[in-house]
Amino acid sequence: MNNVPIITIDGLASSGKTTISKLLSNHLGFYILDSGVLYRAFAYIKIMENIDTYTVDIIAKIINGLKIVPKKDLGFSIIYNSNDITSNLYNEETGLEASNISKNEDIRNVLLSIQHACVQEPGLIANGRDMGTKVFPEAMLKIYFTASIDVRAKRRYEQLIKSGSSPNLVNIQKSLKERDEKDINREVSPLKAAKDAIIIDSSELNIDTILDKILGLYKISRV
């Protein structure tokens, strides 16, 4: 793992992490890991199997059946007991449950080995909340995204409009503020920038400028 370049992208919700991660992956040809999908996998399994409480034995059973498989498009498929469950993970119920599961320290710890197994040649873009602080502290380049609440709410609003929803901007702002509070102040792996992370405020920067900046930082880190 030490010889494979890793770039971590952490930061606030709707700050641009996912967009820039995909662009970096396409530009560099690196695999891309969205760590949130692993918590969604646990959430989906909990819902489907009617699990009430995560005991040590149940967590071990799930981990034994859970695999993450690299795809040709540089993403990963989530396999559980030989079934591809990836397409089932992106609904509201699963997302809400995943938010609760992400606070479980036992689950976060057992997922470390799965996330480490995602390190593949020629490199990995790791997108999440604690990629640079806990999962890949040895990463060659760590980026932390931030942006104003107004800008992030507007971005989320526009995303929902494009998807056919009828969102309320004020409600989105409230939701983001609540999520920030939970992410930053939670006891297990709170959201924060790694000490050696480059902090990028994406409020006033366009995506091309940000991409060029990170690519430049990557080239410097390779020297």
Residue ranges and their predicted role:
Residues 70-71, 108, 115-121, 128-138, ...:
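Small-molecule kinase domains that catalyze NTP-dependent phosphoryl transfer to phosphate-bearing small molecules
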Residues 86-163:
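ATP-dependent NMP and nucleoside kinases share a basic, alpha-helical "lid"
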Residues 26-92:
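N-terminal phosphate/diphosphate-binding loop that engages ATP/GTP or pyrophosphate donors
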